[in-house]
Amino acid sequence: MAQTERRDAPELPDFSLLKRLARDQLIFLLEQLPGKKDLFIDADLMSPLDRIANVTILKQHEVDKLYKVELKPIVSSSDQLCFLIRPRIQTVKWISDLVNSDKVAGRFRRYKIIFTPQKFYACETVLEEQGVYGDVTTDEWNFYILPLDDDILSLELPEFFRDNFLEGDQRWVTTGGGALHLLQSVYGSFSKVYGIGRCAKMVYESWRELMEEGEQRTRQPEFAKVFLIDRDVDFVTPLCSQVVYEGLVDDIFRIKCSSVEFGPDVTSSDKSIKVMLNSQDKVFNEIRNEHFSNVFGFLSQKAKNLQTAYDKRRGMDIQQMKAFVADELKGLKQEHRLLSLHIGASESIMKKKTKQDFQELLKTEHSLLEGFEIRECIAYIEEHINRQVSMIDSLRLLCLLSITENGLLSKDYRSLKAQYLQSYGIEHLLTFANLRQLGLLEEQQTGETLTVMESKVGKLVNDKTAGKLTDAFSSLAKKSNFRALSKRLALVPKSGEEYDLRVPRDMAYIFSGAYIPLSCKLIEQVLERDGWTGLEEVTRMLNGQDFAVTGGSSSSEARNKSNGQRIILVMFLGGCTYSEISALRFLGKERGCRFIVLTTAITNSGRLLEALLDKHV
């Protein structure tokens, strides 16, 4: 049932300090523009900003009115305008147009742009090109990390995934390095750094440069080991349907900055309610990592216990009643409210999943993971597409089929692609190109074709160049290697084995016992081995780019043995799912350690695939 913390679990660092640092810096920057001012905020910064400095705090520092950046003419009458934005060229061009428009109208105002988490040279170039560089002041708000919960930190950069992995835009690499540098500055140095993936390597290099430039302070480290992993190392995990409670809530209601909006179908009223989902919500904290099949039983027992606590009032004298009202009643009412919401959310999830025939969907996914009944799986996917059930869900199943089968046979690829475009629109043709580029949805390349090309080109060049070309052709023919990886790391339990979801034996419980997430299995294996030794075959199948670096002094490592050595930071570059976080929490309990997840953003199959849709769709 509900998982409980081990008594010997290490204490987590206090991440509220990161919020205070971010708040203090923002206030300092706002005060650089003295007097009343209107503040324009990027839409995707509004929720994170509310967690750092709410409207009351902003008003205390002479912010008069707040507006959302909408890239259209403004209605502000203030003489001072402040813009809090991400470093995006489109937004900077819009600000430049506003300034130039005021110039034409003979209107004098003061303008300040605060870029967060950092400003890029390209943005300053736009200001110069538009002729407004001398009319605005620019600053940086180094808001690298938003603590979402006791063990979840986020850069809140959902665009990181598309920009880095699809567009090849590496501008956010320095942001990742800056986030690690901030953690090291505040919570002490790390003794060991492990990583896998091209982006992970670049983020590590960026962080190392910042360390070499900055002043090194010696202090008691609060956590020691760091593991950096690229999202493209493991695409299977985010493409699987989530079945732990927190993951399901995210899939259906979309959690944003640890907050979710429950509609009338959940609240049993005509109003929607915004709820914070974190460890402060005691009901949620007990069920967040549970497989959904266990949640109703837990909530039912909780409701009975609550009723028993209420029933204590009967037979109380006046003094006892006073004490009950003063000490317990408020807490019971709050628990009752939260319990009602989570029961409502569970019922809503159940209705939606029953309507979607969720069990049949899971059966298909599990067959794909195991490599069984592939023709039946393809027939199910075809039916899914032809019934136009869900554009994203159909795409997800196609990608899962392609990755687990190391690409699709030509006839299957062409047939499924044609059916998809016919059902959802020809405009998705470019989306297929994006998916192919990332290796998510590919047509199998026959070995003969590559061999013929290789031999023909090889005759035209010398041996040295031919060697390089062979490597290039090998990379063209690279496959996801999921089947081999699955066998090597025992990711898929043997078919027919009984799996008790009430008493999970490994991380596979997060996918109903069908699959251990590759990302989390890699972390487990590397920590057990204290490096990549013995995993050479695995890293080769993952196209290399693995590293393990010892940092800090031996005395630092000795100090870590008590608490810090048992707290491990895992940085996901390109996004992390709530299912992976649940798996790492389970692994932490098994190993007697705690994992802190630092991610560029929380993701799921919907967000990941939406990021890869062609921008014109």
Curated annotation (Swiss-Prot):
Keyword list (alphabetical) reads: Developmental protein, Endosome, Lysosome, Membrane, Protein transport, Transport
Membrane topology annotation: Peripheral membrane protein
Keyword Cell membrane attributed: no
Superkingdom per UniProt: Eukaryota
Query: According to its UniProt record, in which tissues is this protein expressed?
Result: Widely expressed from 4 hours post-fertilization (hpf) to 24 hpf. At 48 hpf, localized to brain, retina, ear, liver and proximal intestine. This expression pattern is more pronounced at 72 hpf and persists through 5 days post-fertilization (dpf). At 3 dpf and 4 dpf, expression in the liver is predominantly in developing biliary epithelial cells. No expression detected in kidney or spinal cord.
Entry annotated with the keyword Protein transport:
yes
Mind naming one GO cellular-component term on file for this protein?
late endosome membrane
The family database entries (InterPro entries) matched by this protein are listed as: Sec-1-like_dom1, Sec-1-like_dom3a, Sec1-like, Sec1-like_dom2, Sec1-like_sf, VPS33_dom3b
Q: Give a GO biological-process term.
A: vesicle-mediated transport
Q: What quaternary structure, including any partners, is listed in this protein's UniProt entry?
A: Interacts with vipas39.
What this protein is reported to do is described as: May play a role in vesicle-mediated protein trafficking to lysosomal compartments and in membrane docking/fusion reactions of late endosomes/lysosomes. Required for proper trafficking and targeting of the collagen-modifying enzyme lysyl hydroxylase 3 (LH3) to intracellular collagen. Mediates phagolysosomal fusion in macrophages. Proposed to be involved in endosomal maturation implicating vipas39. In epithelial cells, the vps33b:vipas39 complex may play a role in the apical recycling pathway and in the maintenance of the apical-basolateral polarity. Plays a role in bile duct development.
Q: Which family does it belong to?
A: Belongs to the STXBP/unc-18/SEC1 family.
Name of the protein in its database record: Vacuolar protein sorting-associated protein 33B
From what organism does this protein derive? Answer: Danio rerio
